[in-house]
Curated annotation (Swiss-Prot):
It comes from Rattus norvegicus. Coiled coil: none annotated. Residues 1-25, 59-78, 355-385 are annotated as: Disordered. GO terms for cellular component: chromatin; cytoplasm; nucleolus; nucleolus organizer region; nucleoplasm; nucleus; site of double-strand break. This is NAD-dependent protein deacetylase sirtuin-7. The gene is Sirt7. The keyword Transcription applies. It is found in: Nucleus, Nucleolus; Nucleus, Nucleoplasm; Chromosome; Cytoplasm.
Amino acid sequence: MAAGGGLSRSERKAAERVRRLREEQQRERLRQVSRILRKAAAERSAEEGRLLAESEDLVTELQGRSRRREGLKRRQEEVCDDPEELRRKVRELAGAVRSARHLVVYTGAGISTAASIPDYRGPNGVWTLLQKGRPVSAADLSEAEPTLTHMSITQLHKHKLVQHVVSQNCDGLHLRSGLPRTAISELHGNMYIEVCTSCIPNREYVRVFDVTERTALHRHLTGRTCHKCGTQLRDTIVHFGERGTLGQPLNWEAATEAASKADTILCLGSSLKVLKKYPRLWCMTKPPSRRPKLYIVNLQWTPKDDWAALKLHGKCDDVMRLLMDELGLEIPVYNRWQDPIFSLATPLRAGEEGSHSRKSLCRSREEPPPGDQSAPLASATPILGGWFGRGCAKRAKRKKAA
């Protein structure tokens, strides 16, 4: 014993050795119990049965772990309603759309998968592939066009059946579908929009190419400058782990106002794992009886399923096709010649043509726009947005390091 009643250095080392030995014995016992539990009860020896009886706490812990793993696996599985069940549910959804006084639509990556843009948590989603250590690939994002779901939402808004759209997507397809900008809140930004934050109000520049080529998490400058004040422009993307502060195109003010007025919310293609963290979108300050009725279209489990008045297990395009038919509304066909982005876009100034190497959108697929310095149309390598999967990759690295 050291002077003063404390342990000597050799005693502390001996105590540490004993602690480590006990931990290793506990881990070995845990491994033994785990191996036994994987056997069928009839195949266990008497000695193994005795060990399980003596290790009730470990058995309970391992069985709990197994249940949690199975629960997580089930949540990741995609479930499809059979055609008749889906039609029945769509009829119910159509009734809710007709009777809604203020319908707000929340959209996620699942509505753009038909445009060859992967979602995040599906079987081939960005998160899923990164967690498995597999590369993320996609078709060239500049080749993506608004899907049947995008065009249906625009038509519903035109007929005053949808009042506002809140989107997590950065692909700009809602804008390109003809939905008015006042009716969209792109909470995580738009790959076609860069802004000058020095100008008051902020000056927006809509482009016909992906402006995020040089940007990433916490690095938002695009390399171009404001035509008015000369300040460096920045993209509008909100990466995982960032907080969006721009007025547009995030349009949080309109999103929260729409949510506060909503009596019905339709969630399309969103896992809701991010949106659930935005309490302003769910009217959680209201008593449950006064909150909006929730309708969810997703192939997988979402954390809001228990709150939903109806959950439809189906692909967004399939559900929206049935819904529009039930409502007696025609689904407009996307026409590149009428894409609003071309009338909204600010052209590059002289000397800026080489400021990006992304493929530019053009009304005709035959020829690139004049002076375009972007990648050729038949590029063999998919060109992904600077925003695409960046935050995911960063998080995956942190998890691996941990």
